[in-house]
Amino acid sequence: MTDIAESTAHPRDGVPPSQQTTASVASAALATATASASPTTGSATSTAAPGKRSRSSSTGSAKGSIGGKKATRACDQCRKRKIKCDYDNDKNVCSSCNRNGDRCQFNRVQLKRGPSKGFNRNNSTSSAAGASTTSSTHQTFNANASGNTNSSNNNNHNNNNNNSVLLPPITQYFQGNEQNHDQQFWKVPVDLAGHLSPHHSQSHLHRDSVDSATSNNSNLNINGINIVDNSTTNSQSGGYFPVSACRSRASSVPSFPRKPPMQIQPPMTSMYASSLGGGTPATGAIGASNTAVSGATVPGTSSKRRKSVVSSNESPRTSRASLLPRPDFAVVNLVPVPQNVVTPASSLPAVPSGPLPSTGVGVGGSTGQVRLTDLDLINTYYEFVHLNFPVIPINKKALTSDILVINTSIEELNDLVIVWFRNSLELLVTVSLEQPQTQSTHAYTESLNSCFQNVVNLYPRLKQNNGIDPKVKIVYLCTFLILIYVLFFLGQHNSFIISVSVTIFNNFGLYGKLLSLNTSSPDSSSPYDIIFVRLYLLLVTFDSSYSMALGTPKLLNLEINGLVDKFFNLKSQNEHLFIDENLIKVNCILKNLELGEYICNASHMKDSSDAMKVIKSTYMSKKHQSKKADHSSSVSPMFISEWFQKFLVDKKNLISLLLDYQLRINDITPLQLSKLYVDLTNSLCALITVILEILKLMMKLNPTNSIDYNYRPLQHFDIDKPPSGGGGSSSTNTSSNPYSNPNSNEFYQKLLGLSSDRNTNLADMTRGCITPFAIITINELFNVTELIKNIPSSLISVVMESTKEEKENTINPQDLVLKLSNSMNEIVQITSLLTMVKPYKGIDSSYPRWQKFSKRSGPIPSMAPSNTATSTIQDFSEYNMTRSPSLGSSAYSNNPHSQHSDHNFNETNDYNDNISIFKKIYYENNNIQNNTTPQNEVLQSYIDTAWRLLDDSELGWL
């Protein structure tokens, strides 16, 4: 009787009590009568505890309450609403379902959770007794139990010694019969929990809900794009899937996980908390997607990784709520583009039109902003960054469908590489967004240093794994280049980042790949090797630019003549090797990279400690003219990079022109002097014109060097019509996209003629794009302008006097005076533009030294009477460049009493006289007395300007 009553205590799964068979009801009634006769036995056997049930061998056995009693479990509708259920057999419906017009159903299959009641691991007797009374699917084994020698217990004993639970692949539950369609859940034996550690027991048995075999929560659809989790099993973390099963479920699409484990968190990560305040949860669309992902239990991921407390400081704008999920990155399905087909930029996936909110938690702790998704970060990079300097030297399709598809056996390490790649890219986008300068650059510097430290910490683990996927190495090395880009973008002086990056690049053997591929055809080489060579060439460009900007020796003293065109402009049929899918953009990228190639070649003398060798071989020899310089001077520039390259060439020619007369200044003839002044006028006017063109383009395209979603690059180009004018413009009308930069001043736009031209120029492709060389460019333009701005007014009187004394006057002095007058007008415009072009970030940025130069701007010597020549030269000698010792070059100043509050230490005078460093070295080697008065003092003053320009070129621009 007891067994019968116990078997009928609960309703059958999926069958309401009203549908029980007559025989079952009769048996239940008999059990009730027996219970009434024997209250002690009946009360212990016939009443089932709420929420518990006994499994019956018969599928048709009835479970539930009888005799008008309430059911012992809530119906599915009430359980879903989480309300109390008062189901009654007489009505066959509860009050809640009756009000809502629903029908009570009991289809949900409930699993037991946790160990069995009263289970004691140390009690071998209880374990043995439990093993004899439990079904075969719930067998348990205790190593100390005796008398149990069957084969199944031996197998369980072996599994217990291995301290692991291996279940068959989940795919075996997908059979074609109807019975398996009703049973959609896979189960872990409850009694096996005693043989698992408490940590594993909680992670595998005490989950929020059971794992459905047919509903794979790792396959989500965010923003209409299919993304799949690429987790694999970590055998050391107690995963409950076999390794082979997890690998079969591995994804073929990339992901940007945001949750590295706790073991890779150096102390420097704590700097984010104080400087960036990333404790506010992200809101908006990404928050919704994170909520969807966070509900998924990814097989093969240990509970230790799921439960680890991840610091919110891993990214400068990553909140704790946004770090816990693992949002995936999707494949962007782009149509393959043949080499001879130009794909308009409008057909590429891009960020939706209109302004986008800034990313994450703002720098300094400002909240209320929406974090950019992974796809938005990629689109932002390729729209605003890639065109001026491809720090990720592949096109968007190759990045999203190949390089970021990473899933190897070292799954945890791969996740960390992707995490810091994403954080570095987000840092770049964060610091470049258009925003008010209310924060200190210290916050950005702390973020950069912390991110770089975490990336460097991954290097030993990557280096010791010889079989690591080349794609992981590419992503890892790209992360270094992105951080160096941020370093240049902020104008920071930190040679540690570049030096460590050079060391890691060399240890990965990239120099050997460059030597190997340079002697063979790149088309026949491995695509990954070509990408490695591109990364190395970009690092050489950064190193050379840093050397020129700070006046320090190069770390990679390589000549890369012709290598940019060889490795970045491949004629290969492999579309993944294209630097961009739009051929017009490819041309723009190559032009910008050629600037780095020229800077690399111009800084090749930084390996010499002999200053005289630098002076004589580089600036005092007319034979030393690079082919690149001759070529660039004959081609009309279009882009800022080409104009700046021409500026460097013209500056070098001006220095060489004047220094060539240093030795024979006392032996020069009047005819030679007249010719010198003509050449000086032409060279000086050309240099001033180039400076103005660069500043006008910077003002027109992106005066703040920031990303502004309201001021995007042009998306359509008409390449059928030939270019017109000196700027290579095409006649595509851009009335829908006028040159009305919201950040610029309308008055100066009209004054400079920037608002009247409505025709598209090829240089306007880079409108709104950022560049890493904006700060060093504006500083160099400022330095040269301050040194030469007074020379045109002085040359006017000099030219007039020299042409009068010449008997055979073949030069019209009015033409020279007109040129010099126009240059004086251009100097005024340059001075105005230098105050408006502000690529600096942060309120404490190192702006050009306006006051330092203005205090030393003395009059240029002119054709003055002999009694005033000495005083004039003295005034002009005070016009000297002041250099900051924090920039890696020797500090020297003309005013020993000057105090500079923008540095942490005082500047000192290396020399007592008011001459340049290179001039002093030259005078000492040639036994020339500095206090000797030259016969032509005016010419000597111009040569002194050339010496100071030489100091600027060789000792740093910043």
From Swiss-Prot:
InterPro entries: Carb_Metab_Trans_Reg (IPR050797), Zn2-C6_fun-type_DNA-bd_sf (IPR036864), Zn2Cys6_DnaBD (IPR001138). Residues 884-898 have a biased composition (Polar residues). Residues 75-104 bind DNA. GO terms for cellular component: cytoplasm; nucleus. Signal peptide: none annotated. It is found in: Nucleus; Cytoplasm. Residues 1-73, 113-165, 197-218, 291-322, 720-740, 884-908 are annotated as: Disordered. Keywords: Activator, Cytoplasm, DNA-binding, Metal-binding, Nucleus, Repressor, Transcription, Transcription regulation, Zinc. The keyword Metal-binding applies. GO terms for molecular function: DNA binding; DNA-binding transcription factor activity, RNA polymerase II-specific; zinc ion binding. Residues 21-64, 124-164, 730-740 have a biased composition (Low complexity). The keyword Zinc applies. Glucose-responsive transcription factor that regulates expression of several glucose transporter (HXT) genes in response to glucose. In the absence of glucose, it functions as a transcriptional repressor, whereas high concentrations of glucose cause it to function as a transcriptional activator. In cells growing on low levels of glucose, has a neutral role, neither repressing nor activating transcription. Belongs to the EDS1/RGT1 family. This is Glucose transport transcription regulator RGT1. The gene is RGT1.
